């Protein structure tokens, strides 16, 4: 117990006595028995007397001690969200973070908040993420750590800029860079306030007064220092390379800024590249009587004008075939002969085969420019999965193509401009035509005219789209700033071996994504972001960046923000005193660069600004699976590049939210769940009731977050029902300790009833398991373990058998105080166990605990504390063997009141008999612990069967395996349960069948009443 009222349990002597050598634990009333009977035996408490004496009738109503608490069983309608708001105010939710930061504790737990994007209303994905983080933080705080959790927002970038421009419409065309930036900042701030309010309403504990924002000048300055660190190490460079390019956004994009449309339709074509000069081997296989062409397939016809080569796989087999339709000879992969012939609706006769290496030194002519030669070149990226096994290569429009061109010094001319339109270099027929639309049409017609088009067909496949404009992208070479991640990747993968990933499979996913990444383009051609601190010469292809110029810019940004790049004149951005340090070039010869940094670099350097201490390493990063290629990766790469260490120790990856049937949420399907509606209810509250924040939190904790997470009305109703059952359990606990003071009324553990000691034993096991599950971040198992405990072990089992003791014994009777002592400990452990998940409910319960005089906050009183003296595995044998017999008894009287029967238990002499004697020392009793478990009129314990029995008895046989000293001693004992109707009458006070007549009290009640 951690209410701060008393030390727990007896001293060292009692502790030594408690160290019994008993068997392996089993759950209560588990079927650890084997038996045979003429009736069906059911594991249930059906048939048990589970009454609550009626205090509203009869002359004894004032003598019954019924539960007393103001804790409500249910909160209806607006009561739930309104109560939560009252609790947040009363219990100091807003002060909790600063309070715990001021504690003097040795350990610190740092969870680094991946910044959500500041461009919209809060959604259930936010709820899933923030609540998971809060559960982890609240547990670690209660468990003794100081929490470092600074929320942040990703404020720059294309999505915000596009949203602002789209809202402005035609007006946007006339805006200056600074006007766009001003409106983008205002938009981001508004989104941040909406999201922040929602996060606070959900009960998220954080440093809300000191959040980080990527548009803050101090943050931007840190980012620029990291950029220059990497530049100074030679890891950042400017180059002309193909990158993903969004014509709709007019900027380069990173892989993480793409989304793939599986329904994209491309126009795929089979194209002839006439053989110009055969390789020596190929020349020996053809006689020159028929035209020979290299056969190529592509899904991007618009790239054909930029072709510079055709690539083959050196190790593969190729075939020279004759086409039955045209008589022409074609060269293609031997494995593709049949499938390509079928596609072209013809037949191929194989003339000869050769190895890929035998194509070396061959050339073919460009299919649109006959005078231009395209060499045949080896390449490892060629596959046989689709196409012809020969790949058209346009260095300006493909990553692998660029690699081949670099190796063989091929031209890399780009024929496409920033708008995705052919330039004049492509020729008059193509100039000014959009490559993905009319440009493709014209290229195909040109191929037809040149008689080099064999087939065109539509292909539905996955294709990259701009994540914000939802329009297709192209690959286009341009001058950009890149990070050389080849060397960084090697070090990063080595460092990842020391990082714990949950689930473990996420590590492989992240490594695979890094391996597929040839380089990282970090420049963007927009204005809403952090400028790359580079100056370009007005007339020469030169740029200026060094430590002096960068540090000057960094200091300006730190003081005034990155707007200075667009507002200050060149002579202030490049003052003479700075230029004199580097040889004195004239500032007027240079202009500030127009590129800004990729937002993944923006957010990926957050570790440098947010993480505390010299190590600057977070204990935990926790984000959605999309961040394996996003923030997790950009944080790792920048951290490894700048300081050769990973920024995190543990990475948790959760899934995405879906509709409750597993479908994607969309307005058209009408299945979008808004967290504000979940918490506060919708317009029609009969259809969209206010669940409150705790239901949202329970949904998060109860979900298998490592896969996709479903949410919908039935899921939320199930969460509400779970919490309702938990409230009933808590109300029972609170109501039955109303007259109990732990300081004066507690019973020493060794003097408690066996069943009460047994519950403490189970409670300690529960506490240990829950603590370990929280440490493993397995919140779903925490919920399931708790739910099982409060429904099965408490409501269905323990509460049903102790009601008589609680309600009908004398107020200060040790038997009653014994179970109240257990109830206090149960209440303590249960409340602390769910507090990180349901903070509002935990605080509400805390305010209703009668023996806490000035309750403040359960979160300021620590984690679960149990005593080693509670651990009594030996008691399990007594209680569980009795439960096996009880199950047998109750199963024999389905639907009937157990209190109307008496039970004779016959056990052969041995260990089982001695164990059961712990529960009943006398031969027959209506008040023993055994009879309390049986819930019968009376219980008799015998070593041999009675000689005379009436004809209406039920005989049940069974066996119970006793396990002692960890399995060293095992003994199977037989028992018999004899059930017969009682001859006693119903007591008018306790309703047990223990009275001599229906109008007289049973002996126990007579004694209690006479003492009142």
UniProtKB/Swiss-Prot annotation:
Effect on the protein of changing residue 203 to R: In CAGSSS; uncertain significance
Q: Which reaction does it catalyse?
A: tRNA(Ile) + L-isoleucine + ATP = L-isoleucyl-tRNA(Ile) + AMP + diphosphate
Q: Which gene encodes it?
A: IARS2
Gene Ontology annotations of biological process type: isoleucyl-tRNA aminoacylation; mitochondrial translation; tRNA aminoacylation for protein translation
- EC annotation? 6.1.1.5
Please give the organism.
Homo sapiens
Q: What is the effect of changing residue 817 to H?
A: In CAGSSS; uncertain significance
| Keyword tags | Acetylation, Aminoacyl-tRNA synthetase, ATP-binding, Cataract, Deafness, Disease variant, Ligase, Mitochondrion, Neuropathy, Nucleotide-binding, Protein biosynthesis, Transit peptide
Pfam families on file: Anticodon_1, tRNA-synt_1, zf-FPG_IleRS
Protein name per its UniProtKB record:
Isoleucine--tRNA ligase, mitochondrial
Q: Which disease is it linked to?
A: Cataracts, growth hormone deficiency, sensory neuropathy, sensorineural hearing loss, and skeletal dysplasia: An autosomal recessive disorder characterized by cataracts, short-stature secondary to growth hormone deficiency, sensorineural hearing deficit, peripheral sensory neuropathy, skeletal dysplasia, scoliosis, and facial dysmorphism.
